[in-house]
Amino acid sequence: GLARAARLGITSVHNMDGDEAQVLRYLALHEAGEMTLRVYVPYSVTPATPLAELQEAAAWRTRFHTSHVRAGAIKLFMDGVLESYTALMVEPYADAPGNCGSALFSTEHFAAIAVEADRLGLQIFVHACGDGAVRRTLDGYAHARRVNGQRDSRHRVEHIEVIHPDDMARFARLGVIASMQPLHAPLTRHSAEVWPARAGQARWPLSFAWQTLRQAGAHLALGSDWPVVTMNPLAGFHAALNREPWRDDDPVQRQTLAQTIAGYTHDAAYAEFQEHEKGQLRTGMLADMVLLSEDIFATPVADIARVHPLLTICHGRIVFAE
C-alpha cells in the first residue's frame, strides 16, 4: 500500500480504519524510518461503542502525534449506500416506493455522541451518502454547537452523494467540511449502473453536488475512498474535470483545475487542521511534493489521466523516483 501510494504521488492520507493495531503498525514503520507518507487516523465508533469510550479517542490525540502519524478524530457510519437501498433518504427511493433506507444511529444517539466528542475537542467524520443521513449528521453537529458553544471544529460529512436543498447552506453556517470523492460520481448517467435510478431524476441536480456546495460556501476536501475505487489522484482529477450533467438543465458540477488541485492539497490539509503545515509549496511548509510527467495546466482535461508522477518527496525524502 505505501509503495503504491508513493508511486501515485500521495504524501498524505486519512485512513478511515480507525483500528489501534493499524495505528501501531504505522508508528512502528515511522520509528523504523519506513513511512513514505503522513497518515491521520480517526477512532472508529459503532452503535455499540459506549459514550465513555470517547475518552480513549481523545487520548489518541496525544498518544499518536508524530510527524507522520496523527489522531484526534472519530469516524462513524450514519448509513450505507444507495445501490443496496441502505442509504438513508429524506424521501423514498425513486425505484422503491415507501423505502427510505435506514440509519445506523438514531437522531438522539448520534446527537449524544456528537456533543461528547465535540466537548472533548475531537473532530467528527461521518459517512453519509443519502440526503437523510446528511441531514441527521448536520442536525447532530448543530446540536453539539448549541450545547458546547461554537468552536473551529471542522466536523466532516463523508461522501454526500445526495443532499436536500434545505441543507445546502448548513455546511457553511456550521463550518462543516464536505469530504467528497470525484470517482464516486458517474461521469454521465449512461456510465452508471443503478445509481441514477435509485436517486431518481428529481434528485439528480443535487447528486454529487460539488460545485453547488462550493457556491453555498462549503469547504470541500477531495479524496479517493480507496479501496472502493483507485487511490490514483490523477484518476480523481479526470473525474472531477470531465463530469457531464445528467440532463441538459442540471447544474454543472464539474470542477476547474485550480479547484481540483486545491481539493487534493490545501483544502484536504485544511480538513485535518494542517493547512499551515502542508498542502502548498511555500517557504516554511513541509517538504511534501510530487513532480509530474506533464504540465497539467497545459494538458487537455480529457487526457489528464495519462499524467503520472516521476518523483514523490515526503518530509524532504525521495520516496519514489521513476
Spans of model-derived segments:
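Short acidic/polar active-site loop segments enriched in Thr and Asp
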Residues: A3, T11-S12
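Metal-coordinating catalytic core of metallo-dependent amide/deamination hydrolases
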Residues: D19-R135, D139, V147, R170-L183, ...
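Residues that cap or delimit alpha-helices
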Residues: S106, T299-P300
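Residue-level recognition of the N-termini of beta-strands and the immediately preceding loop/turn
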Residues: T11, L37-R38, V69, R151-H155, ...
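Short proline/glycine-enriched turn/loop segments at secondary-structure junctions
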Residues: T62-R63, P300-I304
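His/Asp/Glu-enriched, well-ordered alpha-helical/loop segment
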Residues: V115-F125, C129-H155, I160, P165, ...
